[in-house]
From Swiss-Prot:
Disulfide bonds join C186-C426, C320-C334, C344-C367, C351-C360, C389-C396. It is found in: Vacuole. One of its GO terms (biological process) is proteolysis. The gene is cpyA. It comes from Sclerotinia sclerotiorum (strain ATCC 18683 / 1980 / Ss-1) (White mold). Its main location: other. InterPro entries: AB_hydrolase_fold (IPR029058), Peptidase_S10 (IPR001563), Propeptide_carboxypepY (IPR008442), Ser_caboxypep_his_AS (IPR033124), Ser_caboxypep_ser_AS (IPR018202). Its EC number is 3.4.16.5. This is Carboxypeptidase Y homolog A. PROSITE patterns: CARBOXYPEPT_SER_HIS, CARBOXYPEPT_SER_SER. Glycans are attached at N217, N512. It is an enzyme of class 3 (hydrolase). Coiled coil: none annotated. Gene3D superfamilies: 1.10.287.410, alpha/beta hydrolase (3.40.50.1820). One of its GO terms (cellular component) is fungal-type vacuole.
Length: 546
């Protein structure tokens, strides 16, 4: 879960502001300096920052001025970093396994030319990974073999929590899937218990088996990232997707080194919502290392935010009755969104051209207000156009509160080796920080063509979602410039159906690229259509076709 709606309205978005950021012309070469060092000082007021805005477009500066005028006190008091979570680190002796990145870094082998080279690429010396065996009988989430633990970045005091479930079927041969929720700032453990994991939790805290769990035929890693999300913690912060990608590569490298029995299996990355940002970057990071122990075969993105310039154009059609469901907005509101679109697209284009915080933040603020705000103000569920938001304190879903209650139980945290004092399903500070580093509108879709040259990509979308709707996802896949674009756009749409012939959606595919529309599902497809989601997952993992 989820692309958070917290930053849709300007009041929420203006809760914080970031200092000047270097232009991310080549982000994969600019992230070498620790984020916590680069962003270690509190914010200056917006009035002070305007001295540095000389290179901004007039449109972008106007948005900054609007926010400053409406929320001057919030801007003056803004602080970029949240307080670290209270935590107590356990000694290494408390864990069943400890693997040190420095040990992996120091392994040298002889290549075919007789030259010495590192066995595995990457700067791993600052990373360690700790793991413990989870007793399935104590928690009762599933009967399969499980591990939980932390990836530690010792240099930057970052600690990412993960929970691994072995396949219920044939773990020695079944693939491994990394699952990522979005937000940014939402725990992947919400995906575990709300969507695709082995069990769900009711209002009484009772566990219920999920027969459509994604570990039916695959082992699954649920990862709380970036730091300070879920059970993860840090004394600093990660506030952009690029920095998070380095951590994920390190985690997977150390995990497969410690558990080589899974390293030979096919590996896939899947996620939803803001994972539409995460997955292209994380995949690019993995594929950039030619000597690796990660057998990456494909990626899957569900209801993602990937190409804002294309996707934001489709909020008005979805809200106004052109996405297969009745209109939520009246004609005057739809017209206002039409009128706002050119300015929104101009701001996003400026962000794409410069990749600078000064262009990307105004684009996010203006477009979120103009293109999402009218819908959100109706009280309709932004994650499912078919109904109202029933529990605003839990992002419209009461089950999120039940999950938090369960994961805050001392017995649960003890069995998992948790080192923080509390669990929250979503960290809104992370969401704010990513927004005000300009990450929200970064053009990470530009990485997809290179990925398509190497591995298959599946984009799927529940057709009742508003916030990352199927119209926008279909549009960006068709707009993507890559060698196979013409063939993909000309491909025939086919029915997606279960073995019994029941139609669950449609899809189109060409080369390594596939787009699927899932009927009757909102933002969280595995929750709304569990049988259909497991069916297309199994088909995809089998031969990358639906």
């Amino acid at each position: 879960m989820k692309l958070l709606a917290s930053t849709v309205l300007m009041g929420a978005a203006a809760a914080s502001i970031a200092p000047q950021q270097q232009v991310l012309k080549n982000p994969f070469q600019s992230a070498s300096k620790p984020i916590s060092e680069a962003w270690s000082k509190s914010m200056e007021s917006l009035n002070h920052l305007t001295d540095s805005m000389k290179d901004m477009t007039s449109e972008a500066k106007a948005v900054w001025d609007e926010v400053s005028t409406l929320f001057p006190e919030a801007m003056d008091r803004a602080t970029f970093f949240q307080q670290p979570k209270p935590h107590t680190r356990k000694p290494d002796t408390a864990w069943d396994y400890v693997v040190k990145g420095a040990d992996i870094q120091n392994v040298w082998v002889e290549n075919s030319k007789g030259e010495k080279e590192r066995e595995i690429d990457g700067k791993l010396e600052k990373y360690n990974m700790r793991a413990k065996k989870v007793d399935p009988t104590k928690l009762g989430v599933d009967k399969v073999k499980q591990y939980s633990g932390y990836l530690d970045d010792e240099e930057n005091d970052k600690h990412l929590f993960y929970w691994f479930f072995e396949s219920r079927n044939d773990p020695k041969n079944d693939p491994v899937v990394l699952w990522l929720n979005g937000g940014p700032g939402c725990s992947s453990l919400t995906g575990l218990f709300l969507e695709l994991g082995p069990a769900s939790i009711d209002k009484n805290g009772k566990l219920h088996n999920n027969p459509y769990s994604w570990n039916a035929n695959a082992s699954v890693i649920f990862l709380d990232q970036p730091v300070n999300v879920g059970y993860s913690y840090s004394g600093g912060s990660v506030s952009n997707t690029i920095a998070a990608g380095k951590d994920v590569y390190a985690l997977l490298t150390l995990f497969f080194k410690q558990f080589p029995e899974y390293a030979k299996q096919d590996f896939h990355i899947a996620g939803e919502s803001y994972a539409g940002h995460y997955i292209p970057v994380f995949t690019h990071e993995i594929l950039s290392h030619k000597k690796r122990n990660i057998n990456l075969k494909s990626v899957l993105i569900g209801n993602g935010l990937t190409d804002g310039l294309t996707q934001y154009e489709h909020y008005r059609p979805m809200a106004c009755g052109e996405g297969g469901y009745p209109a939520v907005l009246d004609s005057s509101e739809c017209k206002a969104m039409d009128n706002a679109l050119p300015r929104c697209q101009s701001l996003i284009q400026s962000c794409y051209d410069s990749e600078s915080v000064w262009s990307c933040v105004p684009a996010s603020i203006y477009c979120n207000n103009a293109m999402m705000g009218p819908y959100q103000r109706t009280g309709q569920n932004v994650y499912d156009i078919r109904g109202k938001c029933e529990d605003s304190s839990n992002l419209c879903y009461s089950a999120l509160g039940w999950i938090s209650d369960y994961l805050n139980q001392a017995a649960v945290q003890k069995e998992l080796g948790v080192e923080v004092s509390s669990y929250d399903s979503c960290n809104f500070d992370i969401n704010r920080n990513f927004l005000f580093q300009g990450d929200w509108m970064q053009p990470f879709h530009r990485l997809v063509p290179d990925i398509l040259e190497q591995i298959p990509v599946l984009i799927y979308a529940g057709d009742a979602d508003f916030i990352c709707n199927w119209l926008g996802n279909q549009a960006w896949t068709e707009a993507l410039e890559w060698p196979g674009q013409k063939g993909f756009n000309a491909a025939k749409t086919k029915d997606l159906q279960l073995e019994n012939g029941h139609k669950t959606g449609t899809f189109k595919s060409s080369g390594n690229f596939t787009f699927a529309r899932i009927f009757g599902a909102g933002h969280m497809v595995p929750m709304d259509q569990p049988e259909a989601s497991l069916d297309f997952l199994n088909k995809w993992l089998n031969d990358y076709t639906l």
